[in-house]
Amino acid sequence: MKISIVTVTYNASTTLEATMLSVFNQTYSCVEYIIIDGGSTDDTINIIGKYADKLSYWVSEPDKGIYDAMNKALKIVTGDFLIFMGADDLFYNNDVIQNVVSQISDIDAVYYGSVLFKGIGTKHLGKFNKIKWATTNISHQAIFYPRIIYTTHSYNTQYKIYADYAYNLNLLKDKVNFVYVDEIITLYNMTGMSANTLDETFQKDYRSLLFKSVGVSAYYIGKCIRCLYFLKESLKKKYL
């Protein structure tokens, strides 16, 4: 079984090499590694070139954002399953791919695990149900998409930050099977783009996407949970 790993980069010279090494150090050998760079102007290209002989493919050219670059990758990868690894994220250990592959029994299902926040040590997010889907997304650095999915679905580039969330919600709407594996997949850097940025277009469509994917009840329960969370955080900042 071949696993495709894709890293999308832009001016990531301070973090990319560590990410690449975490891929190369995987004990599972049937891997293709692809880097899609958006025309970096720092030392990123030199770092990619340093390891070019270990890459299945790489390119550096202007793009229209991270999801445009990810869509480019969807047309190139050839693996049975695909995972996107951020240019500032790391596989949790050298056996991650091997551990996940050993648990794959349905080649048409989406497999996902958890991530661990760098510097905090908090595990995120465990197994999902409809209500959890209504409150948050699975980190795309923890998802393995099968060929039947990544060859037939692309990212909506109108969503600048949360196209991966919309992607997953649309898969749920289409009754795609998501299978949880009890593994930490990635050390996730919370300073990345989606960790600190809003997506106004996505927010406008959020309710509709959830109604169609998880249902009205789960949406409103999730909304209550989010409101309570933000109230708790606000009170902590005010009184602690």
Task: Indicate residue ranges for each PLM-predicted region.
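Short aromatic/hydrophobic "clamp" motif used to bind/position activated sugar donors
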Residues: L82
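Acidic helix N-cap motif at the loop->helix transition within catalytic regions
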Residues: T14-E17, D42-K50
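A conserved acidic beta->alpha catalytic loop
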Residues: D37-N46, G86
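Glycine-rich, basic loop-to-helix element that forms the pyrophosphate-binding segment
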Residues: S60-V77
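Conserved nucleotide-sugar donor-binding catalytic segment
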Residues: I120-D205
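Short, acidic, metal-binding catalytic loop of nucleotide-sugar glycosyltransferases
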Residues: L21-C30
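Conserved donor NDP-sugar-binding/catalytic core segment of glycosyltransferases
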Residues: L90, N94-H124
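Short beta-strand/loop segment that forms part of the nucleotide-sugar
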Residues: C30-G39, V59-S60
